[in-house]
Amino acid sequence: MPAYIIGTITVRDPEAWKAYVAQVGATFGPFSGHVLFRGRKAGALSGAAHGERVVVAEFPDLDSLRRWHESPQYQALIALRNRGADVVLTAYTD
């Protein structure tokens, strides 16, 4: 069953964030993950959303998603990610 990760993002350091984004995509492949959508908030319709940006990525299953998140390749980027932005990551399945 597919699993999805949704990241809500508030960029604090655009240069650090740009460097993170340039590298993070390569970490998905070994876990058969891919980005479905990246975008900026266009406006609130109901309630308050965290972040000005969002990313949605799909993995074949929750185990693959968790293995990606815990992988040395991704873990090595977390300090750069945290320097560049406030990020909330949440996993979802059916």
Where does each model-flagged region fall?
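Short, conserved catalytic or adaptor-binding loops enriched in Gly and charged residues
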Residues: 26-27, 80-82
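C-terminal end-helix/capping segment
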Residues: 82-94
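Low-complexity, intrinsically disordered Gly/Pro/Thr-rich segments
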Residues: 71-78
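Short S/T/G/P-rich N-terminal loop/turn motif that feeds into the first structured element of a domain
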Residues: 1-70, 91-94
